[in-house]
Amino acid sequence: MSNWKTLLLRIGEKGPEYGTSSDYKDHIETCFGVIRREIERSGDQVLPFLLQCAEQLPHKIPLYGTLIGLLNLENEDFVQKLVESVHANFQVALDSGNCNSIRILLRFMTSLLCSKVIQPASLIVVFETLLSSAATTVDEEKGNPSWQPQADFYVICILSSLPWGGSELAEQVPDEIERVLVGIQAYLSIRKNSSTSGLNFFHNGEFESSLAEKDFVEDLLDRIQSLASNGWKLESVPRPHLSFEAQLVAGKFHELRPIKCMEQPSPPSDHSRAYSGKQKHDALTRYPQRIRRLNIFPANKMEDVQPIDRFVVEEYLLDVLFYLNGCRKECASYMANLPVTFRYEYLMAETLFSQILLLPQPPFKTLYYTLVIMDLCKALPGAFPAVVAGAVRALFEKISDLDMESRTRLILWFSHHLSNFQFIWPWEEWAFVLDLPKWAPKRVFVQEILQREVRLSYWDKIKQSIENATALEELLPPKAGPNFMYSLEEGKEKTEEQQLSAELSRKVKEKQTARDMIVWIEETIYPVHGFEVTLTIVVQTLLDIGSKSFTHLVTVLERYGQVFSKLCPDNDKQVMLLSQVSTYWKNNVQMTAVAIDRMMGYRLVSNQAIVRWVFSPENVDQFHVSDQPWEILGNALNKTYNRISDLRKDISNITKNVLVAEKASANARVELEAAESKLSLVEGEPVLGENPAKMKRLKSTVEKTGEAELSLRESLEAKEALLNRALSETEVLLLLLFQSFLGVLKERLPDPTKVRSVQDLKSIGAEDDKPSAMDVDSENGNPKKSCEVGEREQWCLSTLGYLTAFTRQYASEIWPHMEKLESEVFSGEDVHPLFLQAISSALQFPLH
């Protein structure tokens, strides 16, 4: 990398590029001297790279802003081009709805104001344009209130830029900035503060409790107003331009041209509730709230940090996580060395966990945060590991109130995190969970972590890791292997079923075809033993052959999948097939999930069969004590919607190729027609058309391009047919899913006249101090330590939690079918209010 590029990238950092100095002023002066000369040689390379640095290392924006201010003193044309590029990029970001670019570029423009590069009045115009758009959006008559998330986002962008230039704006244009803040207050007075209870990390049972709390926009305005009343003084934003103020004041101001905000879709003309809800969902998806604060630690763990400084550090951390997501070590390094004067390890941990647990989904996969936290623990060995451990303990204490989706992610993260540190954890602290009933959330949490660890390592290793709490071995999965029913025992005569299993195994070893196998089964086993025994023999034997490894399993399913398809052509029989798979792998949760997932992948079982099996009696009783049924259900839904997503991508790509083929075919025809219309001499006589060789080539080209276009159109039609079929099946799947949830909940939820909220449900168990029959551990019959919530109530809480989680996760696919779901499932007289509340909170949409 060129020296000038390295200087730009590493400005403000401790490193060899700037010698031993860590002073911002020295860095800026050194970089300015090099960049000034480089602009004369290759200004067209410097400008885009400088902009890229400012956008992708936004915690250094004050440094880049000051550098540009100094360049403005000597090369106004270069800076004018830069300002125009910033404006153009900002407009593109607005047009495309690129949230991160909009926010960062507005911060950058505010910083350029501090360096006397941008005219304050023109920045105020940008603010007011965004604010005007926001106010229009939430206006019932002129706008589309369903798109309030976009309006909120614009206001957040204005407020979030002020820590970087509010002082200068208050000094140079005090009336104008006051007008903007008053306008924001007016906006807040007309917008709706809708419930986001379905996106909360913790659920205390009060469905509308979040309405009484300040939301993110209101809270941010309070922080900015406190900052303004404090003279715009904060510790988290460097102000290097002050060191060059005497020089920068001589710079020429540059004007920002007007901007135009993106228009929202028109509100539904038919006043459809479902369509309005879908628009709101689309807006929330496009303009999601960046962070939901997770207050894990007590206030005394943080230094005396102003609320606005906390906000700025959160911005720094989220920016680094976003822009350096492909360079995890650089990411961790920057996160550990932010340009602030106070310690922030606790705030960093809270921010990271808020992203891991963020609902409806985090910006990145859990694995990314796992690696960043691991690197931070190594970069800050004396501080961060203890903070992370403290966060885990704090979350463990609140695990019974944690959202089910967030709880699952916490389990996945923590088990993976421990695998990076030799599975070391003071398990004796959590050994008390064995005294709790097997359905207690803390006990289930520890159990699921240990089972996940076994997947990431091996049984003996995990047993060794809990040697300080050996009793926890009870929560490990069974060490035994597959549950093969036809194993041969010495000294005992083979049963008829064992003989048939051995014969089937021999045929597999002889590599007989699936067709031959089907004929043999239909002639030998089925007529004598009937369907159930036949299915048991076939499933047990083939799975046993495939049990040696994942590759063996895949090979068996690929080679003999037709046998399963022939035996189980409909959903009823596929449910029985899944039950047999579960029986064979009853000692291995992971292999059960893998086998079922592969069978669905090969279309041996349908997603509807999996839903029916998950909600069958053998699994329903496990809903509150094991994650296995939910994992399998989630895998099936994921695979279903991944297929739809893949089909949509294929259709999009083929559509583009069709347009290209159309153009190529049209051009070929035009060229042929032009050639045919020309006169040429053949043996001295004028003939219509060019020479025969060229004409033959042109005709061949027309034929080939026409065939290519036709082939693509046929492929497009086939994909569209598959998509329509998949969407039709999805509607049936969703109806089955919600009907299944409704059915099992109806059987166990208390009378709706007595229980109308989750808090009511929890209070039932809390009021009853005496252990009931359900408070006895069914494994050994001994009474367990009392739990705040009884088993039946905990089953209801867990099932409602997963109902909310699945509804929220697949909301985009649910909305197109909302009217049918409302009419056929949600509107029945016997629908329990807790069932409707779970779905309403997930969709952020009231159900009546």
Curated annotation (Swiss-Prot):
Q: Which PANTHER family match?
A: CAP BINDING PROTEIN, NUCLEAR CAP-BINDING PROTEIN SUBUNIT 1
- InterPro entries cross-referenced by the UniProt entry: ARM-type_fold, CBP80, MIF4G-like_typ-1, MIF4G-like_typ-2, MIF4G-like_typ-3
**Pfam short name (any one):** MIF4G_like
What GO biological process terms are annotated to this protein in UniProt?
Answer: 7-methylguanosine mRNA capping; abscisic acid-activated signaling pathway involved in stomatal movement; alternative mRNA splicing, via spliceosome; defense response to virus; long-day photoperiodism, flowering; miRNA-mediated post-transcriptional gene silencing; mRNA export from nucleus; mRNA splicing, via spliceosome
How does the annotation summarize its subunit structure? Answer: Component of the nuclear cap-binding complex (CBC), a heterodimer composed of ABH1/CBP80 and CBP20 that interacts with m7GpppG-capped RNA.
Give the UniProt subcellular location, in the record's own words: Nucleus; Cytoplasm
Q: Which residue intervals make up region (Disordered)?
A: 767-786
The gene coding this protein = ABH1
The identity of this protein, by name, is Nuclear cap-binding protein subunit 1
Per its UniProt entry, which superkingdom is the organism in?
Answer: Eukaryota
The phenotype of cells or organisms lacking this gene is: Stomatal closing and reduced wilting during drought due to abscisic acid-hypersensitivity in early abscisic acid signaling. Abscisic acid-hypersensitive cytosolic calcium increases in guard cells.
What Gene3D superfamilies does the entry give? 1.25.40.180
Its family remark reads:
Belongs to the NCBP1 family.
| Gene Ontology cellular component annotations, sorted alphabetically | mitochondrion; nuclear cap binding complex; nucleus
Q: Which organism is it from?
A: Arabidopsis thaliana
Write one Gene Ontology MF term.
Answer: RNA cap binding
Give all residue intervals belonging to the MIF4G domain.
Answer: 8-228
